[in-house]
Amino acid sequence: MGETAEGVEAGEKYVSIPQLAGVGTLLSNGGKEIPLSSIEGKRICLFFSAHWCRPCRNFTPKLLQIYRKLRNTCKNMEIIFISLDRDEISFLDYFKGMPWLALPFDTGLRQKLCVQFDIEHIPALIPLSTTLSHGFRVEEDAVKLVEEYGVDAYPFGAKRRSELEGMDDARRQGGNLLQLLGCKEREYVISADGIKTPISDLNGKTIGLYFGAHWCPPCRAFTKQLREAYDELKALRPGNFQVIFISMDRNEEEFQASLSAMPWFAIPYSDTTVQELSRIFTIKGIPTLLILGPDGKVFKTDGRRIISKYGAMAFPFTESRAYELEEVLKKERDSLPHRVRDHRHEHELELDMAKAYLSTQLFHQTPSVQPCRLNLKTLREEYHLIFTNSNRKTSRPQSSYTRQQRDLNNLYSDPKHLPQLHKHFDQSNVATAENSLRFLNGEPENSDISSIHVAFADLAGKIRGEDDKRD
């Protein structure tokens, strides 16, 4: 089937009309026989598919929409359906929803064509580019191209694929927010209250492109973290940082539910830019936060990690800022004791969990790092690790502790109090956490005391008060 000749690259495949079908006629949707000669001069796509195949059933409506658009614009193309259904009844039932042509149902013929066109999976859409002297040139499977670019993928060949990828590169690297976030019909972003803001107003700002969805629990959790950082930056650095939500929701209702919890902007749900941005930046999972610098170019693809770890302190989200924060945390971590003694144990106990927790969540006020609010979601995730060893104590004598420190130390060493401590911890709020942080920051000289004893001393006081009432 392949041939090498002047003007033809080795390895290219060509087929003639007789080779293409192996039959004299094609079928129309109504069952009418169409002469094979009717497709001469047209751009042909071979559609290998079957009704029993779910990906095929999902792809067919997309192809149908593109086909109608192209035919309405007088594009000289035709699709030929090659059925891999199990029987003729299934083939006819599937074909009745297709406006294009089909080969007659023939299991032997389809097997031959699958070998001829290297079909290893379905759906498969094989474009055939016409040439003057070699019949039809066989192109690569275009299913992915059609799914990613829609009608813009036409005429579905390698040349068009290269053009589209070049256009994506230009949008990704060009630094033009209007070209990146807008389209012909829209030069604005929207907010939850319906206000339209010109994309040009975002020029010169640091932008977070947030890919998420309401149905995704990690997205809902990260939205809360991102909002905390966003609100803090809005107060401390007004106008410097903005977020654009790109919805991966399944419908408009879910999109509105997502947007209702967000104080920032969004791309409209039904806008084609949503799919384009997901393709341009190769989004593989959600939540994903990309950071664009004031020049409009992406310089950080792991915005979720840096926001979750540092919050607003990470701004402007550069590598140098992340390094600075890590150095501060390292000094904080290294200042903590590695081991403590417990009078009930002969050996020393390691404080790895508490130390690791403190190093990533609690920050002393220093010239280079501003105080931050505790992230309660993280606290709730970590508390079961923090309180696992109910016998742990520090080596300092109890007489040197403050009353708050003694409260928590006593509760910590008595297993019967742990359920109460857990209950209060789960019911704590931001104010409680901030009070704990202020208490910690107010006594830097006590850094040799277990960080947990200090940080949650106010919770212990509440529990002690309940114990006093019961007694």
Swiss-Prot record:
GO terms for molecular function: thioredoxin-disulfide reductase (NADPH) activity. InterPro entries: Nucleoredoxin-like (IPR052259), Thioredoxin-like_fold (IPR012336), Thioredoxin-like_sf (IPR036249), Thioredoxin_domain (IPR013766), TryX_NRX_thioredoxin_dom (IPR045870). The keyword Protein transport does not apply. SUPFAM superfamilies: Thioredoxin-like. Keywords: NAD, Oxidoreductase, Repeat. Residues 15-173, 179-334 form the Thioredoxin domain. It catalyses: [protein]-dithiol + NAD(+) = [protein]-disulfide + NADH + H(+); [protein]-dithiol + NADP(+) = [protein]-disulfide + NADPH + H(+). The keyword Transmembrane helix does not apply. Its EC number is 1.8.1.8. Belongs to the nucleoredoxin family. This is Probable nucleoredoxin 3. It comes from Oryza sativa subsp. japonica. The lineage of its organism: Eukaryota, Viridiplantae, Streptophyta, Embryophyta, Tracheophyta.
